[in-house]
């Protein structure tokens, strides 16, 4: 299992950063996501399910993303999602925003990638922690970059 927790401060309002995580804007921060369609409940509800299609090179992967936790208050916003990728990995992601002041937001990105079968566990053991850290850092940079455009 791979786990991570990283945080950064973004020089803009919590509302602007949070808007990037709305369904209509998700492709801005996750450019490899080609489809993100709500199929159950409302996007701001625990238990909401989305059909998501992700492109990795020439390969397309489609899976169901379930919202496990959702909080939207003035000073803190949090969303936790989970999905199984390629029948091999169970991925859980948590995006937390904490209002520091009117123009600064703490962004915390944490998650875990767990092998659900022998192939998944073997691939995680063979994978590089360095490359996973790079993906996490690139995502955080992308969120920061997109937030500054708003």
Q: Predicted segments — roles?
A:
Residues 2-5, 60-65, 88-94:
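Short, surface-exposed coil-to-beta transition loops
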Residues 16-21, 26, 50, 67, ...:
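Hydrophobic pocket/interface hotspot
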Residues 38-86, 138-150:
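Glycine-rich portal/gate segments that line the openings of hydrophobic small-molecule binding cavities
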